[in-house]
């Protein structure tokens, strides 16, 4: 993928359609993902071949519960970098989108940028104003937002929050509905974790969403 700044990004996937790596030669950066079933449990980002940050995420179904980060933090007094480790707990919307992170002492360490109904960030450079690099990069349930493209990886398709639609049509064509590029009709309460079939609520477990996909494919 080539973005508007001329950067070329490469993405790798496993046999189950799970993205396991993304890299950009111009930035000399690479991020590797390890999955626990249908969720990214661990990610490591390298820059110039050296580890820059680590992240371990814990989910309850499709909802982020906790996030452990390790990264180099620069001391503004002497500009020395030290390896920092933090644990934060997430508060999420009904659609799975994280609103804020809090440390064990209850202090807010990160909060979501204002966004449109369909997830489009409304303020530029929001993350650069955050005290710590803790952005979960999660959009709605099952979606991982890519800053380099402005798109969200949604397992089997990519979602565009600017248009509120997928970039690829429904794999089963018009059998899936009159609008094969559409996301869910109400993104505040409905989700589509796999990019294949919508689920009525966040609390529905993974098996419930998988059953929804099965019913969807056979036309129930």
PLM features: residue spans?
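Beta-turn initiation residues at beta-strand->coil junctions
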Residues: 1-6, 21-27, 42-49, 66-72, ...
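Short, ordered coil/turn segments that flank beta-strands lining enzyme active or ligand-binding pockets
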Residues: 4, 15, 26, 36-37, ...
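Aromatic-rich beta-strand edge motifs centered on tyrosine
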Residues: 9-18, 31-39, 54-63, 88-96, ...
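Hydrophobic "anchor" residues
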Residues: 19, 40-41, 64-65, 98, ...
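Short, low-complexity export/processing leader segments characterized by acidic and small residues
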Residues: 22, 120-124, 157-167, 171, ...
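A motif-centric feature for acidic-aromatic and gly/ser/thr-rich catalytic loops and repeats
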Residues: 78-155, 188-190
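Catalytic toxin/effector domains delivered as secreted proteins or via bacterial secretion systems
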Residues: 199-220
């Amino acid at each position: 993928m080539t973005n508007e700044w001329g950067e070329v990004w490469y993405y790798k996937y496993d046999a189950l359609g799970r993205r396991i790596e993304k890299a950009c030669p111009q930035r000399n950066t690479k991020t590797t993902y390890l999955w626990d079933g249908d969720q990214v449990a661990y990610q490591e980002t390298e820059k110039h071949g050296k580890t820059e940050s680590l992240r371990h995420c814990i989910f309850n179904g499709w909802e982020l519960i906790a996030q452990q980060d390790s990264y180099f933090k620069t001391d503004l007094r002497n500009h020395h970098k030290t390896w920092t480790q933090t644990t934060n707990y997430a508060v999420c919307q009904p659609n799975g989108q994280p609103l804020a992170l809090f440390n064990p002492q209850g202090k807010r360490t990160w909060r979501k940028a204002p966004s449109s109904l369909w997830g489009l960030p409304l303020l530029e450079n929001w993350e650069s104003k955050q005290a710590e690099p803790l952005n979960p990069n999660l959009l709605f349930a099952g979606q991982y937002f890519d800053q380099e493209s402005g798109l969200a990886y949604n397992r089997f398709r990519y979602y565009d929050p600017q248009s509120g639609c997928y970039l690829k049509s429904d794999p089963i064509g018009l059998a899936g509905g009159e609008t094969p590029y559409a996301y869910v009709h109400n993104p505040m309460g409905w989700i589509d974790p796999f990019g294949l079939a919508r689920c009525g609520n966040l609390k529905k477990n993974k098996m419930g969403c998988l059953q929804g996909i099965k019913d969807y494919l056979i036309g129930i």
